[in-house]
Amino acid sequence: MDKKTSRLRRALRGRKKIQELGVNRLVVHRTPRHTYAQVISPDSQVLASASTAEKAVTEQLKYTGNVDAAKVVGKTVAERAIEKGVTVVAFDRSGFKYHGRVAALADAAREAGLKF
């Protein structure tokens, strides 16, 4: 089993648990160059999103693939979710370790007002 398949299997286990709870989830995806975050409802509707691929976010950054960029994405997605009335979410790390950019995004979202 390769590295990507292992990550996807971990992601499915976590998502199944979150779907049983029936709450909105904050989904994180990362690539070497970008970090993406979405708030998704239990019926699979995207309520808010932010990524380092967006011009509004990229203008604030020197480089898009680091911890500082993840903090900006976390803050932005939290602000957009709160505007839509979403304050409580479950954190879906998509099989990535809770470390580095993933942890930085989560901490920034918490500081901006999301509860999880």
From Swiss-Prot:
Gene Ontology CC: cytosolic large ribosomal subunit
Keyword Plastid attached: no
Keyword set, alphabetical order: Ribonucleoprotein, Ribosomal protein, RNA-binding, rRNA-binding
Pfam families on file: Ribosomal_L18p
Quaternary structure, from the entry: Part of the 50S ribosomal subunit; part of the 5S rRNA/L5/L18/L25 subcomplex. Contacts the 5S and 23S rRNAs.
Family of this protein: Belongs to the universal ribosomal protein uL18 family.
Name this polypeptide is given: Large ribosomal subunit protein uL18
Taxonomic source organism: Shewanella woodyi (strain ATCC 51908 / MS32)
Gene: rplR
